[in-house]
Curated annotation (Swiss-Prot):
The lineage of its organism: Bacteria, Pseudomonadati, Pseudomonadota, Gammaproteobacteria, Pasteurellales. One of its GO terms (biological process) is sodium ion export across plasma membrane. This is Oxaloacetate decarboxylase gamma chain. Catalyzes the decarboxylation of oxaloacetate coupled to Na(+) translocation. The keyword Thylakoid does not apply. Its EC number is 7.2.4.2. It is found in: Cell membrane. It is an enzyme of class 7 (translocase). The gene is oadG.
Length: 85
């Protein structure tokens, strides 16, 4: 075989391989879309129920007054541990 024949054969194999890969990818895309539609049809997402009471975005000031001694005690405990290490 001459170089020209080998080159032509290589081009033919390359085009055939690229065509096969393109065909396979197109089939794969359609299969995934069909499976996605089937899953969404037979297993729909459950609807989210809203919470009974909205969660307040800000802690009421009365709660901060109750937490202040706890925070002070935690800071003091942490500082004592840091000094002992």
């Amino acid at each position: 075989m001459t170089n020209a024949e080998l080159f032509g054969e290589g081009i033919n194999l390359m085009i055939a391989g690229m065509g096969f890969v393109m065909f396979f990818l197109i089939i794969l895309i359609y299969a995934i879309s069909v499976i996605s539609r089937l899953i969404n049809k037979y297993f729909p997402d459950p609807t989210q129920t809203p919470p009974a009471q909205p969660i307040p975005a800000v802690i009421p000031p009365t709660d901060l007054e109750r937490l202040r001694p706890v925070i002070v005690a935690a800071i003091a405990h942490h500082r004592r541990q840091q000094r002992s290490n």
